[in-house]
Amino acid sequence: MTTDYLKIGRASELTGRDHALYRFLEILPGLLSWSTLLVLIILSYFQPVWVAMFVIAFDVYWLLLVIYLAIILISAYRQITHNLRVDWRAQCLALPPVDLVYTPLEGEPVVSVGVKWSDLYHLVIFPCYNEGYNIIQPSIEALIKSSFPRDKMIVILAIEERGGPAIQAVAERLRQEYENSFFQFRVIVHPDNLVGELKGKGANQAWAARKAKEEIIDPLGLDYNLILASVFDSDTVIYENYFYCLSHKFLTIKKPYRHSYQPIPMYHNNIWQAPFFARVAAYSNTFWQMMQQIRQEKLATYSSHSMPWRALVEIGFWSTKMVSEDSRIFWHCFCYYRGDYEVEPLYYPVSMDVCMDETAWQTARNLYKQQRRWGWGVENVPYLMFNTIKSWRVIPRKLFLDKIFIQLYGFHSWATNAIIIGCIGWLPLFLGSDRFNQTVLSNNLPNVTRILMTIAMVGMVLSAIISSLLLPPRPVKTPWWRRLGMIAQWIFLPVTIVVFGAIPGLDRKSVV
């Protein structure tokens, strides 16, 4: 039987040389990160001059990178604020009918003639496990409050059988409240312990999508080319014009069927109640996603996003064996369409929950686990490299190699940069010999590092300003001085980057 390499989840699913190759590629990201750190630690003892010179050069690189990213962040912020002011409903109404051309990998193009925004259906899937009514209900209510016609929405509440009676009771309550509010509203239960599945969102939402196809879309004869599928985390609250913005983008870009559509996650649902370190981590993630939207070549799907139903059906839905199903769906499409698939930035936000628990300590533990779970995205690196090797003769090689470098560099820098600057950069002073400590370089290393990092604090100041501008209004019962904390919290950014960024990223790479 021929192996479908595009559906591979890990090396254990392969045999022989394929297993050995994929296993090596799985180890590679962690090997590179740990090797970088260990080599610098060892050289700090044997060759402290080399490490000191490297640290100074790295600090200069970091400073230039901070300035570059600050410019990009400002540009992204301006684009977001512009898109929030746009009347996307009016923009859609003003659009003339367009002809959409879908080109399969094999066969003749299919043309949908004279498509208007009102012809589109939006399939919305909320995968849930053990979330409570108070988490899910605002997400569905946001669909009600949006200005997009609800008779064009198919809403699926995808719950897990293993969630037990609690989630089933929540789902039944929501079904009773909303089953007549949309074109279709269904609760779909994902069975537990299905063979070949990893317990996670990917398997749940893939099951829900297949059932939606079998029980709703196919029986009603809906046109695959006129459906956009959105998978939202259960706490995702859309803004009023999200589906108008999405529809407008779909109807106006080239190759709409070869794009996924990515909003910007803003963790505003409970931002005023969350501890300061959780807020800093949440905004740091938002800022990174904002900057990625400007740098489209680096953008992959993340968390809540939308994509053409046609593409989703063609590739066989989400992987049922991955932790990072949100990004894997993009890389699956990218490899399936041989590089002719991109992520289109929407520059439009959705609101989600900050990681938060009953106590600060529990929040810190859960935040670390969340960051570590996000670090599972590194599993896409061996997937991309392996499929590049297997498809070497039929793919645009430079494009694939560029993507591999971007992904490998991104996960490597996530796990190492902050540790190099915050910890290893000082080791030559402690591990170097007395001879090194008597040199001019040794005396100047702390001063040079301090000056460069002080200048680089422009990024921290900018983060405080933009986060304040994006912040939702202060709740009535929240004291006024809490706003001061929203600014002062950024003092802890360096520590947060290490504790809730680099360390969980490195931790995840150590599990191979």
Regions from the PLM with identified roles:
Residues 2-8, 275, 288-289, 384:
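Basic, amphipathic N-terminal segments
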Residues 36-76, 406-509:
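Membrane-embedded multi-pass helical conduit in multi-pass membrane proteins
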Residues 78-379:
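Internal catalytic domains of large membrane-associated glycosyltransferases
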